[in-house]
């Protein structure tokens, strides 16, 4: 059983982990909100990085991290769909030996976000109403 003070410490430590991994986002003006963190369930989490012009949602499910980009209408779009629309194929990351897409690893998602942040901002704003 996890008591409240242990939960606060785990959440603080987890926040530090996210800020270390995705710290370039806070350097770029984003703030972090951890929506859920379940260390008892495979370490699953959901978190949102928010900036004035874009939101980025991270959802970790059994160590696979999915990244969605917030659109102006309140909907979310998979990062990979936006990248594919501008000619950056999902195949840039190979399949693992057991057939899983290697792009879902947390460190790969962080590198992708850092590399393609401007492209994602542009793609997300292109889908915003004027």
Show which residues each predicted segment covers.
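Intrinsically disordered, low-complexity regulatory regions enriched in serine/threonine/proline
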Residues: 2-21, 32-46, 50-130
């Amino acid at each position: 059983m996890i008591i409240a003070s242990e939960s606060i410490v785990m959440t603080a430590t987890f926040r530090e982990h996210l800020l270390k991994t995705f710290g370039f986002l806070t350097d770029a003006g984003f703030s972090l909100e951890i929506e859920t963190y379940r260390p008892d369930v495979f370490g699953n989490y959901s978190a949102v990085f928010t900036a004035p012009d874009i939101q980025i949602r991270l959802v970790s499910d059994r160590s696979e991290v999915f990244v969605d980009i917030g659109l102006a209408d309140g909907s979310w779009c998979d990062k990979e769909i936006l990248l594919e629309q501008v000619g950056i194929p999902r195949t840039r990351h190979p399949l693992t030996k057991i057939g899983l897409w290697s792009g879902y690893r947390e460190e790969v998602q962080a590198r992708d976000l850092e590399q393609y942040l401007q492209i994602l901002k542009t793609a997300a704003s292109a889908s915003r109403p004027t």
